[in-house]
């Protein structure tokens, strides 16, 4: 405390911080990026292991042999669906009852805030069908769910056939201690959300649905199944849920264990498992998988029906059967045995999955990075904001032109702004106007779509996207608006105080985001931190303005789309990338209003106003 109370030592510390601030910021930023890249190497990545004792052994004998029956069910389902043009509810009810299930239906409807051009729907109505296999060895206090989503663009008939065949097989076993729910949903995620809201007796998205007539126990785990054909070359697993939530790592380990036992090839992000982590090729392949997971998790989208279960504290996965040109193929029996083994092990659980990690990154199915090892990466990036804020704070509070050494000898002068007060209006005006622009970006696109369609020849979805872009671009005029009302008595100290507030605001936002969705926080910190530190009204303003635009939240989204397709080995042209960007904007707004995805409000109400503050600093007069 003596160092801070002694004015001479305090000034010496301020002088040292001001002198070393720039190299420390560069070093901290490079350390954050390097730490993230090093996560794929064995010293930081660990082998996965089963933490739950009840699932530690795979010594169960899978007896499923209903491949022919599953294919017959699939053919009948596809024929009835083609004939009716919708989900064959009556056929599903009749078939589920024939295999011994308690069968119930649920109707639902939802009017979207604007038409979904990706799936070509606006007024959505459908019916979910589910059957319950009651546990013969216990009361109906706990349950497991096997669900198959059926969308308008893909029937998923093979998965429905396998679900019905598994239901018939499970019905003949007597060892079940948990109820098993076999759920077929219409309209993909909309049907899943309607069923989950009704099951838990909540309404968080404005979905209109009929109450459930039959319930099982509290859902412990769920598996969503998607199959494109009756033979697969691999099973791809999706773990990313709504707002970046992840299932317990033990559920993923269970899937991998039974795939290995049955000889099934399993993939993550469509990538094969690296075989050798000691050479450079293994970590490089793991880096591709890790980046794909980071991009998918940062989007906040539920990448499968399982993503909506996670909101209700239900551990869930989505398994997708891939039929590629690989030589070795597996039939429905192999997939059914893997699912049977997973459900039999989950049947042994005495409590919810909780032993293993909920926050992790996956460079491969057999490797993971825990939260304690990846958080320093974003911590180093946020340290840059802290160092710059400390520098500005010292410049604002340390007055005088000559600083003395501890021995009394005068030291070289540190140029500091004159000791003047900062007018409150110089901070309040840009803060209020920036937040008002963010509020307009959040509210007006959906509210004003009908007005736009009346005056311009555009559809509702196009009107929403164009309004988003117009308001976003209008924020560039913010400095011209705020400079009319701010105080100009201390212009230098005014922009420094505004930047200090903006740095603290950005650091708090990125820190909170990184705690709940590390991938989103890290991506935004990687792009926004350097330009936030560099922004000032002096120097090459044109260069700083170009960098600030290229690292804005919208530009980060656009760059992420190009990187995503590049990692998938399907690069985009500029025109294709722009079209995908416009579609992503519409989907982001739609998923927020439909499922409660938080990416759109985070960007519009938080990060966009903060970015406007740095834009204001850059053009301060």
Curated annotation (Swiss-Prot):
Keywords: Disease variant, Disulfide bond, Endoplasmic reticulum, Glycoprotein, GPI-anchor biosynthesis, Membrane, Transmembrane, Transmembrane helix. Its main location: endoplasmic reticulum. Ubiquitously expressed in fetal and adult tissues. Expressed at higher levels in fetal tissues than adult tissues. Changing residue 52 to A: No effect on function in GPI-anchor attachment to protein. Changing residue 203 to Q: No effect on function in GPI-anchor attachment to protein. A 2-acyl-6-[6-phosphoethanolamine-alpha-D-mannosyl-(1->2)-6-phosphoethanolamine-alpha-D-mannosyl-(1->6)-2-phosphoethanolamine-alpha-D-mannosyl-(1->4)-alpha-D-glucosaminyl]-1-(1-radyl,2-acyl-sn-glycero-3-phospho)-1D-myo-inositol binds at residues 49, 51, 354-356. GO terms for biological process: attachment of GPI anchor to protein; GPI anchor biosynthetic process; GPI anchored protein biosynthesis; protein retention in ER lumen. Changing residue 291 to P: In GPIBD15; results in low amounts of GPI-anchored proteins on cell surface. Glycans are attached at residue 203. Pathway: Glycolipid biosynthesis; glycosylphosphatidylinositol-anchor biosynthesis. Residues 2-19, 394-425, 484-495, 537-540, 620-621 are cytoplasmic. Changing residue 176 to S: In GPIBD15; results in low amounts of GPI-anchored proteins on cell surface. Changing residue 329 to A: No effect on function in GPI-anchor attachment to protein. It is a multi-pass membrane protein. Residues 42-370, 451-462, 564-597 are lumenal. One of its GO terms (molecular function) is GPI anchor binding. Component of the glycosylphosphatidylinositol-anchor (GPI-anchor) transamidase (GPI-T) complex that catalyzes the formation of the linkage between a proprotein and a GPI-anchor and participates in GPI anchored protein biosynthesis. Binds GPI-anchor. This is GPI-anchor transamidase component GPAA1. It comes from Homo sapiens (Human).
